[in-house]
Structure formats: C-alpha cells, structure tokens
Amino acid sequence: MATGFSFGSGTLGSTTVAPGGTGAGSGFSFGTVASSTPSVGLNFGSLGSSVTPASTSASAGGFGTGLFGSKPATGFTLGGTSAGTAATTSASTTGFSLGFSKPAASATPFALPVTSTSASGLTLSSALTSTPAASTGFTLNNLGATPATTTTASTGLSLGGALAGLGGSLFQSGNTATSGLGQNALSLSLGTTAPTSAASNEGLGGIDFSTSSDKKSDKTGTRPEDSKALKDENLPPVICQDVENLQKFVKEQKQVQEEISRMSSKAMLKVQEDIKALKQLLSLAASGLQRNTLNIDKLKLETAQELKNAEIALRTQKTPPGLQHENTAPADYFRILVQQFEVQLQQYRQQIEELENHLATQASNSHITPQDLSMAMQKIYQTFVALAAQLQSIHENVKVLKEQYLGYRKMFLGDAVDVFEARRTEAKKWQNAPRVTTGPTPFSTMPNAAAVAMAATLTQQQQPATGPQPSLGVSFGTPFGSGIGTGLQSSGLGSSNLGGFGTSSGFGCGTTGASTFGFGTTDKPSGSLSAGFGSSSTSGFNFSNPGITASAGLTFGVSNPASAGFGTGGQLLQLKRPPAGNKRGKR
C-alpha cells in the first residue's frame, strides 16, 4: 500500500519492468514500483492492484510508468483503470475528451476513460492499454504515446500522426513500458517515425514566405488573429544597408545634377567654337604639310636628276673628243632643258597678258557691264566643270587602287575583310544624321490656316454639286436653327441655302454621329482640327469641311448639312425625312 504523495508508481498488469522492486513506497516517490495493493484517496495514477494479469504488455501514459493508468479507485481519480483487465464495452464519449478510456466498471463522474469504442469530438487520443476503435473528429493522434496492439484508422482532422521524437532516451518510442521520466508511458513525445525535411521557400532577404500568416485560412485557424495578414515586416539588415546606400547614392547624384544645372553653358559653347577654329587651323596646317611634302619629294627628284646630270657632264669632259659620237647623254639633257624652258615661257606669257589686261582696265576706269559678269560666271562654270571631270577621274583611280589593295590582302594575307567598310558606314551615318539646331526654327511646321481654308474651299467648289450646298456667308438659317429631329436634313428657323458661318449642325446635342453634348457635331470622322465641346467624331465649333481630309487650324470651310436635335438616341420626333438626293455621291 502506497502511503503519502506518490506520483506515478506502479506497474502495468503483471509485467514489472521498473527497477524499484515490489515493496510499498513511502513518502514522495517518483516512478517506483508499488505493490499490488489498491491505493486509497487522492492518487495520481498509481498502477497497483492488478486484478487479472494482462496477456499483452502496453505502455501506460503518465510522467513515469503511468500517470493515468490504474484500477478503479475510490475517490477522485484522474484516469483510473485496471491495467490488466481491458474494458469490454463503454458508451462513446462526445465533446471534449482526453481519450483515456473510461474503465468498464467505473462509475465515478470524473474518471477520464481509457478504453472506448469510438471517441467523437475533440480528443487527444492517447493509446493506453486498451484497443481504441476508429476515432472521428479533431484528434492529436497519439501525441506522446506508443501505438497500441491494434489501432484502426483515425478519421478527421489530425494534427499529429507519426511525428519524430525530439530526443534519445527521454522521448523514445519502444513498446516496453519502463519506469522513470524517459519511458514510453504518456511522455512528451511527438511521434515515432523519422522526420521529413521540407524545402523552405525563401524570398528576398531570406524570409520564408511560405510560413507567412496571410497563407492561413479563417476556417483552419483556431484563433481569429491567425488569419490576419501581416502588413509590415522588418527587412533584414543586409537589405536595409543596400537601400540606405542606394538612397545615399541617389542623393549624391541629385546634388551633382543640381550643380550641373546651375552651371552656365556659355563656357562649353565657347570651348566648342574653339574646337571648331582649331579644327580649321589643323586642316590648313595639314594641307600646308601635304604641299610641303610634295614639294620636298619634287626637290628630291630634281636633286637626284641634277646629280646625275653633273656626273654625266664630268664623264663627258673626261672623254676624248674622238669618242664623243657614242655619248648621247648631253643631247638628251639639252633637249629636256629646252622643253622646260618652253613650258616656263608659256606660263610667263600668260601672266604677262593678265597683267597687261589689268593695267589696261585700271587705266580706262570702265565699269563692269552685265555681259562681263555673265562671261565671268561662264568661265567659272567651265572651270568647275573641268575640276569636276578631274575629280571624277581621280575618284575612279582611287576605286581601282582600293580594289587592287583588297585583292592583294585577300591573295597574300588571306584577309577578306573590307577595311574601308567602317569608314564608309561612318560617312553614311554622318550624312543621315539630323543636324541639331541650337535654337528654335524660324519656320513653323504648322501650315497656314488661311491657305488651308482656301484650299479646302476651292476643293469643295470644284466637286460636282450633289445637293443644296450652302454658300460662305453669315446666316441665322440652317446652322443656327435648333431642330428637333434626326437625320442629315437640316431643319431650323430659316431657309437652308442662305449659307452659314461654317454650316454644320447648330447648338444642341446632335444625333448624327455624336453621343454627348456639343456645340455642333458633324457626321464625318475626317474633319479638321476643331475646338469646342463634345466627344464625337468631329465636334465643336467646326468651321471646316469634314468631307475632305483632315486639316489643322481653325478653317472656314463648308460642311455637310447636318441637323442638331435635342435628342441623343433614336428617332424621337422626326419632322421630315432626308431626300434621296443628299446621299448621292457621298462616301
């Protein structure tokens, strides 16, 4: 008989695995084996007094050898049971139940059942010495207990199943019931099978967005705050640092932009002008260097020729006079010299004639006549034609040389790349590039409104008349009449052929192609750019002809007669049908 405060001492049935022995434990005992005498009083699950030894050993639940597994005791008992005798039948418990199986002969109202046929409702479903049937409802499914001998499938919402134990000996899952804190009686074990590793979905900054609270549903959450979406979360420090660096960089760039915007562009324009002037000077210097190079080459050739002539003269002098008939070099030298003198004399003659003409002009003081100007222009034109012919011949020679050079590279160097293609492409880009103007253009891109209106009027007048065409004028007839009707025939307060100030429909909400309120709506979508109210095809104060192509500006053309009625939909009050003649020739 266990006296005092005992916590979970006892055996399960006839099977004694605890190392405590069979003597009665006195005082505060934690996990020692008690004798088979029944406990009396308030006892937290002493597993004593086995009536009939059980044939099958099962682990009882408790913080030791068994917390809730004993025979029926008198008094207040939390889960008393007869460890050996399994309960035969008991009524199914409904509602919130810990699922510890009420014993067969227990009549205590506070006994938590151990063996039950079916537990429906919210149960914690611990498997003790009994054989539970199918449990339906919300169950934690063997939270911390070993599976019994025969366990059927649990239907319903299960939060557990076979989870892995969180420790070695403390939360083990063997089938033998041992005493102490590390046994497989109702210990704090979360399951029996191996853990399964799930791949974590990490988002920006290493945050697992799959565990966010916005993925939860209101139906599955037991608390109302579980279904609230998380609006603001703190970013990781790495991303915060990057954002701060980016903001600092943007701020610095804005400061640089402000400094640049405060600077004047005159200095840059002056530098640009200086660069242009330097380019011109460089081109002049390059042309001068080219001329000097040609002159140097020419002087080199002349110097070599003079050295040759001097050597010939020296040898001629040393040659005896009797052998001079075989020496033809002096004759060639004198012949070339005479030809040069002839060319120089012709140049001198031309220059002398020009000088005489100039002196004669200065002496006579005669004014230049238009014939002289025309003759000078003709001579300049002939000079340009001759230069163009020479340039064309030079261009053809350059093309031939380019082809020869490319053939040489392809033949001897094995390089078929056109080396002149890059320069040709650059020149083409330079030609096709638009010239950037430094200021607004003095010529407007918009056409003249008066010219467009005149052209529209002439075009309309040249077309054959297909109906009553109102003339250009001022009238309070057709356009000003506020007709109540639909169609293309105008109806108003005056005659229809008196013209009008841009004879389109009058003040009102027209039904010919218009859907909103407007000051004059026409029936053709190809009208001019008009100003006014409304959102139809061509709406507003349209002083143009909508029958022609679209023109820009405020034009004073002639429009097709279109009525304006105080109606926006179908035919409300049609006063007169349009005649068939007005529809001829229209597209």
UniProtKB/Swiss-Prot annotation:
Coiled-coil region: 244-264, 302-369
Post-translational modification as stated in the protein's UniProt record: O-glycosylated.
Gene3D superfamilies in the record: 6.10.140.1350
Keywords for the protein's UniProt record, in alphabetical order: Coiled coil, Glycoprotein, Membrane, mRNA transport, Nuclear pore complex, Nucleus, Phosphoprotein, Protein transport, Repeat, Translocation, Transport
GO terms of molecular function: identical protein binding; nuclear localization sequence binding; protein-containing complex binding; structural constituent of nuclear pore
Ranges of the Sequence repeats in the UniProt entry: 7-8, 30-31, 44-45, 63-64, 68-69, 476-477, 480-481, 501-502, 507-508, 517-518, 519-520, 533-534, 556-557, 566-567
Predominant place of localization: nucleus
Compartments, as annotated in UniProt: Nucleus, Nuclear pore complex; Nucleus membrane
Disordered, as annotated region: 196-236, 565-587
GO cellular component, one term: nuclear membrane
Notes concerning its domains: Contains FG repeats. FG repeats are interaction sites for karyopherins (importins, exportins) and form probably an affinity gradient, guiding the transport proteins unidirectionally with their cargo through the NPC. FG repeat regions are highly flexible and lack ordered secondary structure. The overall conservation of FG repeats regarding exact sequence, spacing, and repeat unit length is limited.
Database matches in PANTHER family: NUCLEOPORIN P58/P45 NUCLEOPORIN-LIKE PROTEIN 1 (PTHR13437), NUCLEOPORIN P58_P45 (PTHR13437:SF2)
Family: Belongs to the NUP58 family.
Job of this protein: Component of the nuclear pore complex, a complex required for the trafficking across the nuclear membrane.
UniProt-recorded name of the protein: Nucleoporin p58/p45
Organism of origin: Mus musculus (Mouse)
Encoding gene (name): Nup58
